């Protein structure tokens, strides 16, 4: 080990204080001093849509935890938005999953009005997992959110994990909310959701 007394920055071009948590990069990790901040878990059963607000404008990532989401005879969809409206265009959605015999299925939707799981409308579908939305401030002036969702369906255990990936261009909106919806307009049967952010 090199003793601290042997290290000197004098004569270097480095100025100022290097925070330990940033590893000298000047970029502070969101996981320092607490990590993800979660709101209270919410029962979303008995209504068609539930909106979660209070995501700060400074967030870098949004995480949503699904526990026992049973949409009924409809598939779930979800959107991001701000206080004026939800984003209703420009979602690029790619869903894939594998069966017990290693058959892989893929569904891709280009420029639709939500992230979604089309075709999964059986009343026994019950979803567990999480999704992350990574915020990307593009050089073209728009903000994009890259989605990574990983789910398991306890109603159909012969399937492996379900992955839903994609992105949405939210333009200049400052996203502060997330909503989950039953696609047919019927009430969601059951589910417990929790939303957090870094």
Question: Model regions: which residues?
Answer:
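Surface-exposed molecular-recognition determinants
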Residues: 24, 28, 33-198
């Amino acid at each position: 080990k090199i003793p601290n007394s042997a290290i000197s920055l004098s004569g270097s071009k480095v100025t100022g204080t290097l925070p330990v948590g940033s590893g000298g990069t000047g970029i502070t990790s969101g996981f320092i001093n607490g990590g993800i901040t979660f709101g209270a878990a919410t029962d979303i059963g008995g209504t068609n849509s539930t909106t979660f607000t209070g995501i700060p404008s400074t967030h870098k990532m949004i995480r949503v935890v699904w526990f026992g989401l049973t949409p009924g005879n409809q598939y779930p969809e979800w959107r991001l938005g701000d206080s004026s409206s939800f984003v209703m265009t420009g979602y690029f959605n790619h869903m894939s999953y594998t069966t017990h015999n290693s058959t892989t299925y893929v569904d891709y939707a280009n420029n639709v009005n939500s992230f979604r799981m089309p075709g999964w409308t059986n009343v026994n579908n019950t979803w567990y997992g999480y999704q992350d939305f990574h915020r990307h401030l593009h050089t073209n002036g728009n903000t994009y959110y890259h989605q990574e969702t990983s789910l398991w369906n306890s109603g159909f255990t012969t399937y492996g994990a379900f992955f839903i990936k994609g992105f949405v261009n939210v333009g200049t909106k400052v996203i502060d909310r997330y909503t989950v919806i039953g696609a047919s307009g019927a009430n969601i049967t059951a589910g417990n959701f929790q939303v957090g952010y870094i």
